[in-house]
Amino acid sequence: MNDLSLLPGKAHKPVVRPRDAASLIVLRGHGRDLELLAGRRPGHVKFMPGVYVFPGGAIDPEDRRPWRVESGGAHLPPRLARCARAALRETWEEVGVLIGRPADPNAPLPAATPIERAYCEHGLLAGLDLLTYVGRAITPSYSNRRFNTRFFLSDARNVFGEPVSSEELEDVRWYPIGQHLLDSFRDVTRFMLARAIALRDGTATGDVPLFYWAKNARRIGVCREALIPR
């Protein structure tokens, strides 16, 4: 018997394993004055070119151990702690702001990595407890670049610095949350933003969501990971 799967054109494309990643939703204001910190991915990148997104990216080696300048992370499971650090680091790299709290001016802050030096130079601690876990999303299996992304929320009152564009995100600024902005987002971005707004307003219900695709359809499941207390 011949194996039809070996015939030309019948080979299955291997599914790419998703990389752990993180993204940070930063909001300021209320009601009609509610704004979101976001930017547009450059047109030359391979993943989501020209799309408006929150700052974020894949986990780096420096995110896998506690930073010397962090606080409030002792209660977090290791994977969520890594993702929270990545969200803070990527936000600094992509939009130029730090999320944290003032450090004790009399306590020395040793720094070994660029992100640690950034916090140290500004006299800040990276507050992992200033983040709220919003949800998780997994890129569809047909994509050749896949991410297992944890989304977090923080408030503008925890932001130090002024947002600026970078090589990774263009047109970075505070955007009023209106229909024009929402129309420019992917469905997963709109979903996580709506969840973040509900969490901030205290109107969110249900468990932490898992946004994924199965059989070419969008699915919303329950994320079983531990929550970051608000």
What name fits each language-model region?
Residues 1-230:
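N-terminal leader/linker segments that precede catalytic domains of diphosphate-processing enzymes
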